[in-house]
Amino acid sequence: MIDTVKPLRSDAQRTAAAILQAAERVLRHDPTASLEQIAAAAGVTRTTLHRRFASRQVLIAALQASAIEHFYDAFEAASPETAPPPVALHRLTVNVMRTKSNWGYALGILSEDDPAVITKRRTVLARLEVLFQRAQHDGLIAPDVNLDWAQRMYRAMVDEAVKDLEPAVSPQGVADTRANEAELDRLATLILRTLLSGIG
């Protein structure tokens, strides 16, 4: 179950964020890694980690909650209800690929039965549906195309593209976990050109 947490001071927020980013890197490389390894990767002591996350279960729950928020923010930043559909589709594709690449471990272990996951999933899928409806209305998608099918194809293409973006990071986070922005832009353009040329 993913719980909400109390707001933190800015310095505490930075520390918590560093720990969560380190947890993503370390656990992606080794899901059995210890809290000591995560603390070391974050550049904090085990005591500091425990002060913020009392147990491994609490840390994992916070990591999942953070990943969900990043995924939701990826949709929010694309303005799917208001931006011109071509712009929103490109923004959304880049944002979602970036989030899936940077938070792949946490997103991969989300429980499909968690109410928070269910709610956020329904919300983002509804927003994606609105965007595809707008794209069809504007002529980007042919009027006889089934939008449910089109969205499934889109999501499958994004997931395939992300596989090539997965960063090979060491537990110490030596490699940069951020996907290359130019490559994200290239892949988003390729995905949308391929998709829309088939259903447009």
Task: Locate each region found by the language model.
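Amphipathic alpha-helical interaction segments
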Residues: 18, 37, 58, 87-91, ...
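Hydrophobic alpha-helical connector segments
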Residues: 62, 69, 73-101, 112-121, ...
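A short secondary-structure junction motif
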Residues: 26, 70, 96-103, 131, ...
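C-terminal peripheral helix-coil segments that are non-catalytic and often amphipathic
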Residues: 1-3, 122, 126, 130-138, ...
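Short hydrophobic/aromatic patch on the recognition helix
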Residues: 43-53
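Basic, helix-initiating cap at the start of DNA-binding domains
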Residues: 1-29, 33-41, 58-61, 66
